[in-house]
Amino acid sequence: MTGRRVGAGLLGLALLGLAGCSTTDDGPDPEESGTPSSAAPGRTGTPDPDEDADEDGEGRTDPSGTADPSESADSHGPGTNRPASRRWRPRPGTRWQWQLDGRVDMSVDVPVYDIDGFENSAKTVAGLHARGRKVICYINAGAWEKFRPDQADFPKELLGENNGWAGERWLDIRRLDVLEPLMAARIEMCRKKGFDAVEPDLTEGYRNTTGFPLTAAHQLDFNRMLAKLAHDRGLAVGLKNDLDQIPELVGDFDFAVNEECAQFGECDRLAPFVRRDKAVFHVEYALAPDAFCRDAKRLGLSSMRKRLDLDSWRKPC
């Protein structure tokens, strides 16, 4: 399993959820197929016909808000900086797939894929582009992972408490002088592989027990640094969770990625992104399908049910 995160309260569910999960995309609902609901509940539903306009997944470029119809998903080619005026920006309601575990299933008919940046090659990204998909590069920004190839580049004094996942420790995000070149290298990797955007994970460390006296101000500085590093390379960037800081950060990020806002009654807090015509890519794990799809559509979220291990299985609204 790759190093993706859920809330600390779901760690027990995460461990249980790795058992008994098939990798069949859009397959049977785990509750219907005998998988315990605590393993990885999510949601069912059928695609919204109103979302067909986003089938091709172009979204909008920034800042003009008008997509260039002549630009294919991979027209810039791997390793090429896109001008800021042509940076991809997905629109609300754009359908997506989020797969961080296992070989990427390219058959899912959605315009946006979010996949692990380290574990997937430029060839995989190009293959998705050839199918007309935009591709988001998942990286861990807020924690050190001992299984990544650059793990030795992180000074020991920057490593804090374990974040609840084996082999991972919170980073001291106050040290922008050290972390900026390390994060720049990761985002540059995404650019060279041809990704269209970046999803930096663990961008709300200040609300956790990290081993460092992190504040909201430290988090804002770190998150804005990440956004600038992506934008400087022509990549879009998504804000992961961090609901409390959306009012301050919505202008710095091109879309949002959220886990379980419906579970905790917080989806309305993502409205600033939708109001700015920016997509909110949203998943639920522990709710029944009919518990959040109606509200998700009302709010303009791009919502689906996923298992906690984030294999290819999905149930979109």
Regions from the PLM with identified roles:
Residues T2-L11, S22-G34, H76-C317:
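Glycan-processing catalytic domains of CAZymes
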Residues L18-R89:
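N-terminal low-complexity, Pro/Thr-rich disordered segments
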